[in-house]
Amino acid sequence: MICRSLLLLRSNAASKASSIVKHVAATGCLPEYSSEAPARYFSSESSLQVDSTEENGFKGHGMLAPFTAGWQSTDLHPLVIDRSEGSYVYDINGKKYIDALAGLWSTALGGNEPRLIKAATDQLNKLPFYHSFWNRTTKPSLDLANEILSMFTAREMGKIFFTNSGSEANDSQVKLVWYYNNALGRPNKKKFIARSKSYHGSTLVSASLSGLPALHQKFDLPAPFVLHTDCPHYWRFHLPDETEEEFATRLATNLENLILKEGPETIAAFIAEPVMGAGGVIPPPKTYFEKIQAVLKKYDILLIADEVITAFGRLGTMFGCDMYDIKPDLVSIAKALSSAYMPIGAILVSPEITDVIYSQSNKLGSFAHGFTYSGHPVSCAVAIEALKIYKERNIIEHVQKIAPRFQEGIKAFSGSPIVGEIRGLGLILGTEFVDNKSPNDPFPAEWGVGSLFGAECEKRGMLIRVAGDNIMLSPPLIMTPDEVEEIISKYGDALKATEERIAELKAKRG
């Protein structure tokens, strides 16, 4: 059977792409000389579709596709998703896939939720668009702002600013923090600290905040005002005999040393995901955020919680801040806010910051930032309905009920010889493939182990996220127990097939 490989390779010529496609078609696997494979480090699954989509004669397209090697959109058949239903999506040839990533960590309520469709349709019929500039706005935007403020209970928040995505939310955070510090007469307090392996978006500023090399390389990033500190991944980065508690203490000390080196008067904010998502699903050590928050408070540095992935039930709590007792000054949300049915993101702003903006507005003038679609009435109407569903259907309790089996079922494969670590909580999981069960022994990059596993999953009708030799699962929050079992079964079958392929590659290597 033809292997639908997840090649994430760079190529300088279409002829090389064509030769790879021909090799896959002839042999069923990647050519072992594919030295460009390291470019796969931060690419999502980008399908080498040489089977089902070909039935419709679909090859190449007019899109410059996100996080996709340029030659793939010309030389390879894309996987074209045609419709969705519950936890499943279907391609244009009718093949069914369980969507074990919920789109991009986002379709929390699955596909084809009639209440969300009706909310959008009703609002389109009433008021399809009006802006929120100059103190003009719409009722859905006002209602949604109030609803979000009432749902966030980690601490009191003051105002909501609407964006269209998580990237825009984190980009806007920087401008808001700069505006705030200018209002306080602190023009030098402008630097941001983020973490290695973090993901905060792909705009110029949010990509700079992100700690993934692929978002910086060839884009002349990160911006000079962004600094990066340690990733809180205990399994990969702890010292010999270092406990999790000691590891967390060391990372907090390293953060403080970085602040002192740069000058506390220059550091404006620290941004962090409660659980790192695209960097490989990395939950922090238990006391990590307690120690980090103490350092930030000591030096009057704002804390931004990037809840774009973790908000609205993903971890088994309404917000990730609830899970780790985080008391942020600012919060970014998106994705599950509307279950991804309409583009929308938002910033939650603390009363302390909004009070400064209000009190200094006569001196500074208007907050001259926003987007045409900020608070779009249709997006807001859909988000309002999504938040109602989360509460009325007890989605948090549902996640808490099914998450243990999801976690235990996948983590049961931790003994695999190609698995280094399986980590996660709630309905989010990451698997890291390494040789010899050691974080210090990666597989040869040209083997593309994560991509091989992703291809095996896709062949079996399951879509996941691949990032180098890390793979991630983040299914819809509405998963049934039977669907959890389906994911576990397909994961196990794909893992066995990948183990066999790695054994073959090792045998050839000698």
UniProtKB/Swiss-Prot annotation:
A Gene Ontology cellular-component term: mitochondrion
Q: Which PROSITE patterns match?
A: AA_TRANSFER_CLASS_3
Enzyme class comes to: transferase
Q: Tell me if Transferase is a UniProt keyword of this record.
A: yes
For this entry, the transit peptide stretch runs 1-41
Q: Which reaction does it catalyse?
A: 4-aminobutanoate + pyruvate = succinate semialdehyde + L-alanine; 4-aminobutanoate + glyoxylate = succinate semialdehyde + glycine
Record: residues binding substrate: Y199, K335
- Where does this one sit in the cell? Mitochondrion
Looking up Gene3D superfamilies in the UniProt record yields: Aspartate Aminotransferase, domain 1, Type I PLP-dependent aspartate aminotransferase-like (Major domain)
Keyword Transport belongs to the record = no
Which residues does the record give as pyridoxal 5'-phosphate binding sites?
G166, S167, D306
Q: Which InterPro entries match?
A: Aminotrans_3, Aminotrans_3_PPA_site, PyrdxlP-dep_Trfase, PyrdxlP-dep_Trfase_major, PyrdxlP-dep_Trfase_small
Q: Which family does it belong to?
A: Belongs to the class-III pyridoxal-phosphate-dependent aminotransferase family.
Q: What is this protein called?
A: Probable gamma-aminobutyrate transaminase 3, mitochondrial
Organism (species): Oryza sativa subsp. indica
